[in-house]
Structures are given as C-alpha cells and as structure tokens.
Amino acid sequence: MQKQVVVMDEAAIKRALTRVSYEIIERNKGTKNLALVGIKTRGIYLAERLHKRILEIEGIDVPVGDIDITLYRDDLSFKDDKTREPAVHGTNIPFDINGKKVVLVDDVLYTGRTVRAAMDALMDVGRPAQIHLAVLADRGHRELPIRADYVGKNIPTSGNERVEVRLTDVDHSEDAVIINKNE
C-alpha cells in the first residue's frame, strides 16, 4: 500500500520560490550577467516562475532557457527499445551563456546524477563564469558530491520513499510536493 503525504502545498511552493528568488538576487549582487536554465521537465516551469519573481522584484528581465540532459545521463532511456533510439526533447538556450552566472533549476535533488548530466550538457553549450543550482526540494541521498546553492525545502527521506513535485503547468493538478511512502 502506498501512502501520500503533502509536504508543500501551492502556497508553500510560492513562498519558497519567492525566498529563493531573493536569495539568488542577493548572492549575485543583483541580476547582472545572471541567467536561469531549467532542467527538463519540471525545472523548466520552476525556472520560469523564478524568472517571473525576479522580474517583479528587480524589474529586470533575466534570460531563461531550458536544457535536455537525455544524452548526458548515465541511465539513458530510449523511446524505442528495438532501435535503441534515445528520447531527445531538445535544448533551448536562446542567449550566450559565456561569462554568465547560470542558475540551473530542477524540482528535486536526489543522487546528483541529473545535475551532473545538466552541467555536462551546459558546458557543451558554452562556458559560464559560474554555475549555481536551485531546487525546490532536496531529499538527500547523494551519490555524487553535489549540493544545491538554493533550496526551497529540505525533505529528509528514507530509501523507500519517493518525492514527487506536481505543477499545474505540466501535471494539470494543484501545485504540491508529495512524499510517496511504500508501506
């Protein structure tokens, strides 16, 4: 039997993203040379929300893009097992990242493998001055030496739990961060 526990509702997510937006601005001493890059899929929508908050706070329209890490993963998935053709969705970074302070944005930080793949993909696009990481939820259990610079909420979990982020933009349900527990 699976039990679901909501650890962040829509209001908590909004507050966390507002706080993270302020932290990004403060740590970078403004928005000069700042860019946001969301990791497909939910990282894209979170990056867009951070972009909106930063625009509201600073009045500056920082560039925002998205990155597909499919070909950089060490657990590559395929759209067709017969042809072994990877399911690639494409990267959209419509600005020069060279010399920029890039904030990678993702929904959940777990093992660190997704972030490693995203950094590899980003370095193939250009050479940013800095790469920071913003996540909505950090659940621990790292396999690689990676940490988030900006965290919406730390959510300690056990190995048999899964953290799921639902966003109205992509999941067509209310915004929520849910822990799924196998019992």
UniProtKB/Swiss-Prot annotation:
Keywords: Glycosyltransferase, RNA-binding, Transcription, Transcription regulation, Transcription termination, Transferase. The keyword Transmembrane does not apply. GO terms for biological process: DNA-templated transcription termination. The keyword Transcription regulation applies. It is an enzyme of class 2 (transferase). Pfam families: Pribosyltran (PF00156). Substrate binds at T41, R42, D106, D107, V108, L109, Y110, T111, G112, R113, T114, R139, V163. HAMAP family: PyrR (MF_01219). This is Bifunctional protein PyrR.
